[in-house]
Amino acid sequence: MKTVLLFLVALAAAAGPAQALRCHVCTSSSNCKKPQVCSASSSFCKTVIRVEPLSGNLVEKNCSVWCTPTNNQQGQVSKGQETTLCCNSDLCNEALQSWQSAAPARTSAHLGLALACGLLALLWAPGL
């Protein structure tokens, strides 16, 4: 038992003090990237995206003691609403989540698939 305890103490001493979380911290109309070391109490990197009717999108990134993500479905953020994204590893809030850029492509893919199925149905059963 003493050996295990000594091993754990030695391992803790060798590891040194824990590193503070690093997040991008900024406010911008685009995907800003400004790394900053967070305070020891911060456990999350938080990104808040607000959709403003007159000024467009506003992106705020910061360190946060707590974070509650919103449950908006992909591409479902309306004007005047905001989406909160949370993560907890170094510089994890660099990129905005893929739903923002992927939603138009996904919509186009669904439309293309629907058109292809419709054409296939017309060719398969021309008497309908």
UniProtKB/Swiss-Prot annotation:
It comes from Bos taurus (Bovine). GO terms for biological process: lymphocyte differentiation; response to stilbenoid. Keywords: Cell membrane, Disulfide bond, Glycoprotein, GPI-anchor, Lipoprotein, Membrane, Signal. GO terms for cellular component: cell surface; plasma membrane; side of membrane. This is Lymphocyte antigen 6D. It holds the Pfam family Toxin_TOLIP. Residues 99-128 form a propeptide. Its main location: membrane. Residues 1-20 form the signal peptide. It is a lipid-anchor; GPI-anchor.
